[in-house]
A protein has these predicted regions:
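Carbohydrate-binding surfaces of carbohydrate-active enzymes
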Residues: 17-43, 47-265
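Alpha-helical scaffolding within the catalytic cores
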Residues: 5-15, 54
Length: 265
């Protein structure tokens, strides 16, 4: 649902309605995309930290108690690929990149991790709260209350271009509530109203990324290079159009070569 992040909430709402006593898990919380042969790399996808943050917060707003990013750590499968037309790289635009690097998406997921660390015990047993809202046409809002009375207000700006900066008037369980909402385009936040106090906090907080190492390793000097020319001797199997290697009983793509004959006129 990365193209419509607010649906993460509505879909979890539906699951909870169908199975109210069952936990709701998101096993593949989309946060990136694969790369294709001749196409764009994962890092060129527009899916960024806003999507990683928004989908997680909207899933929690719906009552999800299990989150698993797909993918959190990118990697490469040198023995083959995931599907036809895909590259062997599976960086997937993951928060922790294929080469071990991190960026703004990692910071976004780290911020979600802080929310879970601080409030996970309250959120998993929280209940949805009925509310009315005015002046928030481009917002998706979800409100939950923990057993101790702590209120969690989830907000997502669905507008892809315009920021949302205005007061939001809510009626929560019959009581008025006003929120000064400042959200960039496609951004999301969580307002925590602590029970029995006037204390409110905004999450996720800004995160600090690890510092890049100063003492870099020395470059590697290649002393010897070996070259092997293929002689193209092998068990050649006709491959009809539309057929894949597994359909021919070939399940190891590492050493497969292709040849074709072209008749010129």
């Amino acid at each position: 649902v990365w193209w419509n992040m607010h649906e993460a909430k509505s879909r979890i709402d539906k699951l909870k309605a169908e199975q109210p006593n069952a936990p709701a898990f998101v096993c593949e919380l989309q946060g990136g995309w694969f790369s294709t042969v001749g196409g764009r790399l994962s890092e060129d996808s527009y899916l960024d930290g806003r999507h990683a943050r928004g989908m997680a917060l909207m899933a929690m707003a719906g009552g999800s108690t299990g989150l698993n990013y797909y993918m959190f750590f990118g990697g490469t499968h040198f023995a083959g690929w995931g599907a036809r037309r895909m590259t062997t790289t599976y960086d997937y635009g993951a928060p922790l990149k294929e080469n071990g690097g991190v960026g703004e998406k990692y910071a976004a997921v780290k911020g979600i991790g802080e929310v879970v660390d601080k409030f996970g015990g309250l959120l998993v047993r929280s209940r949805p709260v009925r509310f009315d809202v005015q002046g928030a046409d481009n917002l998706t809002i979800g409100i939950r209350r923990a057993a101790d009375g702590t209120l969690f207000v989830f907000l997502l700006n669905r507008d892809k271009k315009q920021a949302f900066r205005q007061l939001v008037n809510l009626t929560v369980e019959g009581k008025p509530m006003r929120i000064d909402c400042q959200l960039a385009a496609l951004d999301s936040k969580l307002l925590v109203v602590h029970a029995g106090t006037d204390m409110v906090e905004w999450y996720p907080r800004e995160q600090t990324l690890p510092e890049r190492p100063v003492a870099l390793p020395l470059p590697i000097t290649i002393a010897d290079v070996w070259r092997k020319d293929e002689d193209f001797r092998g068990d050649w199997i006709p491959l009809r159009k539309g057929k894949s290697l597994p359909e021919l009983g070939v399940n190891d793509c590492r050493y497969s070569m292709y040849r074709s004959q072209v008749n010129l006129t």
